Amino acid sequence: MAKLSPSSLVLQGQPELIACLRRQRSNVPERKRREFSFPKGDMVRNIGVWIIATALSVTVQAQVNPTTRDALQHAVSFHVPTVAPMRSGHAALHFGWQTVDGIHLFYREGGPANAPTLVLLHGSPTSSIMYQTVMEQLAATGKLHVIAMDYPSYGYSDAPDHRQYSYTFDHIAQTVAHFLVARDIQQYTLYMQDYGVPIGFRLIQAAPNSISAIIVQNGVIHLDGFPAAQDPDSMLNKYWRTRDLASDQQFAKEAAQMPFPSSANWTQGPNFPPDNELLTIISQQRPGVVDAHLDLWFDYGSNMPLYPAWQNLLKSLNVPVEVIWGSRDNYFTVAGALAYLRDAPKAEIHILDAGHFATLEDPDAIAALVAGFTSRHDLR
């Protein structure tokens, strides 16, 4: 059996496997284990609203003894492959602005135009810059055509006034769909993170036959992985029912005071590049951007009622599914990753020692996982 790499744990099968592995932990020598421990009770700020993010604390074994494996073989497939960083180099991307519905949308693109296409949808408050290194490595393989755009008001895209452009997930998804049409992208694999997940599942709903495969990274369609939204009376759900203008004003103030990344204030660690944060700071200083982001955050509450429909949609799709998750995510816990197995029992689940923006922390591992996943399937 392959040994667990330092960066990744892979499970394929049913969530019940986790409990079974916990019970068998005492049978595995210490040197053959790897433990992932996740912070509990961290207080995090998300768009001006304090939310309590209680992360899942879980211990998973790197090896399973033969008795356990035999007992599980008819119900679940378990494998722990070694994940090595990609060493094929970086291919240069090209950049541009595509005009869609009168809005200039920035995009990054690379790889052979005739290769299977991977569309990457970013989270918030970042932009397509979060995929830069991953895209360079995937383009260098010569086996994928990769493209990622910035949503309106994010990154280098235009920021139309929120009184003229409705910043809702429905509207952003419509804009993304029009962007894909403008770029003549008809069939693609979808990589979705954070806000990209509710945007992406709207695209899947609208055109399920356009999807060749699905890759989800730290984004939920199950409340399992979203502790702050589980209680109907939580601060978050109250905000989504009745917008809190005081919280909005506090966020606007904090956004305006975000400091220039420097040695004096950088707390993200050596693996997290400051370029992403600098672009976010500059982009948010444009007129109307904070209002746009607050409108979209308020509309996030429209996503939870759609979770059951998206879960059923995923069950009905006959496409490969990969889930990549940074275990140190204070917003969406690992339970959200495992929940995808209920709807896609054959999904590959990769748990990384990274945070919410794992593509910035560990792009080599993620590029390797995506390249391996896409190469194992006959994608169009």
Annotate each language-model stretch with its function:
Residues G48-T59:
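Bacterial N-terminal signal peptides
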Residues H122-S124, M192-Q193:
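Conserved alpha/beta-hydrolase "nucleophile elbow" surrounding the catalytic nucleophile
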